[in-house]
Amino acid sequence: MTTLIPVPLGEHSYRIAIGANTRRQLPALLAAYTPLTPKAPALIVSNPQIWRHYGTDVQGALTQAGWQVTPCILPAGERYKTLRTVEKIYDAALSQRLERGSTLFALGGGVIGDMTGFAAATWLRGIAVVQIPTSLLAMVDAAIGGKTGVNHPQGKNLIGAFHQPRLVVIDPDVLATLPPREFRAGMAEVIKYGVIWDAELFHLLSQLPRLDCMGALPSEQFIQVLRRSCQAKVDVVSKDEREAGLRAILNYGHTIGHALESIGNYRLLNHGEAVAIGMIAAGELAVALGYWSAEAAAAQRALILKAKLPTTIPPHFDVEGLLALLQHDKKVQAQNVRFILPTAIGHGQICDQVPAELIRETLHRLQA
């Protein structure tokens, strides 16, 4: 059974299709829910590992339906999320003569999705992109909402564009080959939604015996977790597509999280691990400022630990360097570092007035 979640964004509206084996049903989903046709050449952008597992399924299904699709295989890893790597997509688009009616299919995790979306936003001033996320993090976050981009040496996602996909196809079966560490990273984003938007999701996660392994989760409950997480992202994005206000709430845990990723050269901590530490830090800031209760912060910490995610800053990280990186964050407003702080389970708020000394004290304490 395929669950459809509409993303209502006016002329940029689309659907999220969640269900087993949907990767092989891609042509039927495209025909039913998008205006896209196989008339123009297309690219499938992926990385070697994902292509080895699922490339044949997706390319075969599209080819059988009449699509002219060529793979574009990029190196795996956040450190390759750069303009130089995106140029490889442009080169493939040029060699395959992609035109304005062409489509880019993003088959991979958040890195592939972000780069493919950015390439689609900028090639010929914008062509269609279809997201086929293969990591939990991409399924519940990166593939939804139209944020695309690449990193700059001075900060994460500083170069980018908003470009909504025409369709998001989520096949939970592909998570069978996802490394456990990457599954846990995705669970950080799921917990985020529970903390700042969906109290029912938070309570559902609290009742589950384990959050660190897909195999330990009953399939029906896991689909419910997926659906509620996607719906949370849709609820926010549909109210604020371009992050003029409310959508910034989705950056909970990301202010410090992005700085942690950057200072570790995108190798020492993955995105979810960095966000988990960022949520712990934001929770402590919220308690210190009187916005949140210590009991709620403890409940958040319990979920993060249940997902076997880190809660402290690695001892060899330079906290003063972290503080400097925060000033380059794209969320800085009038030189004030913007934080998303929880006010209750399922609720959060934007805060631009967090004292710098409190941030410093909190980071040093989390490293102790």
Swiss-Prot record:
EC code: 4.2.3.4
Cofactor remark from the record: Binds 1 divalent metal cation per subunit. Can use either Co(2+) or Zn(2+).
Protein localization: Cytoplasm
GO cellular component: cytoplasm
Membrane-spanning ranges: none
Keyword Zinc: yes
Signal peptide positions on this chain: none
Annotated coiled-coil segments of the chain: none
Enzyme class of the recorded protein, top EC level: lyase
Keyword Zinc: yes
One Pfam family it belongs to: DHQS_C
GO terms, molecular function: 3-dehydroquinate synthase activity; metal ion binding; nucleotide binding
GO terms (BP aspect): amino acid biosynthetic process; aromatic amino acid family biosynthetic process; chorismate biosynthetic process
Keywords: Amino-acid biosynthesis, Aromatic amino acid biosynthesis, Cobalt, Cytoplasm, Lyase, Metal-binding, NAD, Nucleotide-binding, Zinc
Residues that hold NAD(+) according to the record: 110-114, 134-135, 147, 156
Gene3D superfamilies (alphabetical): 3.40.50.1970, Dehydroquinate synthase-like - alpha domain (1.20.1090.10)
HAMAP family found in the cross-reference section: DHQ_synthase (MF_00110)
Family: Belongs to the sugar phosphate cyclases superfamily. Dehydroquinate synthase family.
Protein role: Catalyzes the conversion of 3-deoxy-D-arabino-heptulosonate 7-phosphate (DAHP) to dehydroquinate (DHQ).
Protein's name in the database: 3-dehydroquinate synthase
